[in-house]
A protein has these predicted regions:
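Alpha-helix-loop-beta-strand connector modules within alpha/beta enzyme cores
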Residues: 103-120, 168-179
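Divalent metal-coordination and catalytic microenvironments
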Residues: 8, 23, 28, 50, ...
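His/Asp/Glu-enriched, well-ordered alpha-helical/loop segment
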Residues: 200-228, 275, 296-303, 308-383
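Metal-associated gating/positioning segment near the N- to mid-region
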Residues: 48-113
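Histidine/acidic residue-rich metal-binding segments in metalloenzymes
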Residues: 134-303
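Active-site mouth loops of central-metabolism enzymes
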Residues: 60-73, 96, 122-135, 204-208
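C-terminal cap of metal-dependent C-N hydrolases
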Residues: 318-321, 375-428
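Histidine-rich, glycine-flanked metal-binding segment
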Residues: 1-55
Length: 428
């Protein structure tokens, strides 16, 4: 189908284009960008007046729970949630059942995603077999099957020597290592940040050092091996500081922040609500400020969701018993715009870079770029619309969000992937 997006404000970090223009899509590619392109060239015209036209968002960190936990989410519902959130590419984490530690699981996920005809799904491979931290997985085989990166997400590889071997293999194969930074020996049953709020609620806490010591270790190993390190869901002020210093020293490191970590602090927890239980936990206002400033200053380059759906039954338990995790695909863009763009931390161009261009550069895919000849992966975002988040409208199976009822300004209106409209609330 030939689609003409009319009158939108095109924001393209790859070229720094920042102006009102029309975008013509044909044969799954961007065909033309220009002023007043003739409508007769298109089979479908989408009026994007007053909206941003950005490269389709890329989420480097989601959990689609498939295979093994399809009661929480499956590839099809996960893709729909992603499309509703403006995402055209996502990286799914390997902590499934069975673990994505071999080419067969990589192929299963990719083939199932392709059959859904929605968005691009790239399965990340595990670092170790079964995520047991004892023996390296078949990393080369998974890369040949299309895995763009490796990760032990959900935990850290605590054996530093083994992890170093994994980093060396990743460096040899030219793929990044996505690091979940958590010293499991220091968690000690903690369920939220170790601060005054934890004491008030009578809950065991997780200190910042649980994250910080592994961030430090992994940066040192990246420097030692030359591997490309990407730090997942950073939550502490010292993580930001260490990334800054590492970059200044030439270490190949990048880092992501999740919307819940730059939006909420433990001060927002009025009670022991498991929708506020995620890993890493919400931190203090001081940490939130550091994360926002890190994104503003380009130290932290990526905004990812760590989309982690659970059933109502899973979350309808005590803080000690309920699993960690919240959904995020359908709230990330509006929260980023509401908290960071309107909050004065990011420009719309920086928002697009953090949510599309930078992830594409880190994982080495030719996306995150709206110009002729590039893939027609596009999101149309209305920066003016104000509404309340309603979890009951989510396409995801998960309803586990602390943002239900929150008023935000900025909404995804249309998502186009490979030249096909996969979500649309415009021109109805």
């Amino acid at each position: 189908m030939t689609i003409l997006i009319k009158g939108g404000h095109v924001i393209n970090p790859a070229t720094q284009m920042d102006e009102v223009a029309d975008v013509l899509i044909k044969d799954q590619k961007i065909k033309k960008i220009g002023k007043e392109l003739p409508e007769k060239e298109a089979e479908r015209v989408i009026n994007a007046d007053g909206c941003y036209v950005m490269p389709g968002f890329i989420d480097m960190h989601v959990h689609f729970r498939d295979p093994g936990f399809e009661q929480k989410e499956d590839i099809y519902t996960g893709m729909q949630a992603a499309a509703h959130g403006g995402y055209t590419t996502v990286l799914t984490m390997p902590n499934t059942k069975p673990v994505a530690d071999n080419p067969d699981i990589i192929n299963y996920v990719h083939n199932k995603a392709k059959s859904g005809n929605c968005i691009h799904v790239l399965q990340v491979g595990a670092v170790t077999k079964g995520q047991q931290g004892k023996e390296l997985a078949d990393i080369e085989g998974m890369v040949k099957a299309g895995s763009p990166a490796i990760s032990e997400d959900g935990k850290s590889v605590m054996d530093a020597a083994l992890y170093r071997d994994g980093m060396l293999e990743a460096a040899r194969l030219g793929i990044p290592v996505l690091a979940h930074c958590e010293d499991i020996h220091m968690v000690r049953g903690g369920v939220m940040n170790a601060d005054a709020k934890a004491k008030e609620l009578g809950l065991p806490g997780i200190t910042n050092s649980v994250e910080d010591v592994i961030v430090a270790r992994d940066i040192i190993l990246a420097k030692d091996t030359g591997a490309q390190l990407h730090l997942c869901h950073c939550s502490t002020k010292d993580s930001v500081l260490m990334v800054k210093v590492a970059k200044e020293e030439g270490v190949r490191v990048s880092a992501e922040v999740c919307p819940h970590h730059f939006t909420l602090s433990t001060d927002d927890m009025k009670e022991a609500d498991t929708n506020y239980k995620m890993n890493p936990p919400l931190r203090t206002k001081e940490d939130v400020k550091a994360l926002r400033e890190g994104l503003r200053d380009g130290i932290m380059e990526v905004i990812s969701t760590d989309h982690a759906p659970h059933t109502f039954e899973d979350k309808n338990r005590s803080m000690q018993e309920a699993p960690f995790g919240i959904v995020g695909l359908e709230t990330a863009a509006c929260l980023t715009h509401n908290e960071l763009v309107l909050g004065g931390y990011l420009t719309p161009m920086q928002m697009a870079a953090c949510m599309s261009y930078h992830p594409a550069q880190i994982i080495g895919i030719d996306k995150g770029d709206i110009q002729p000849g590039k893939a027609a992966d596009v999101v149309i975002f209305d920066p003016e619309e104000t509404y309340r988040i309603d979890k009951n409208t989510f396409a995801s199976k998960g309803r586990n969000t602390p943002f239900d009822g929150k008023e935000v300004t900025g909404r995804v209106k249309c998502t186009i992937c490979d030249g096909e409209v996969v979500f649309n609330e415009l021109n109805k």
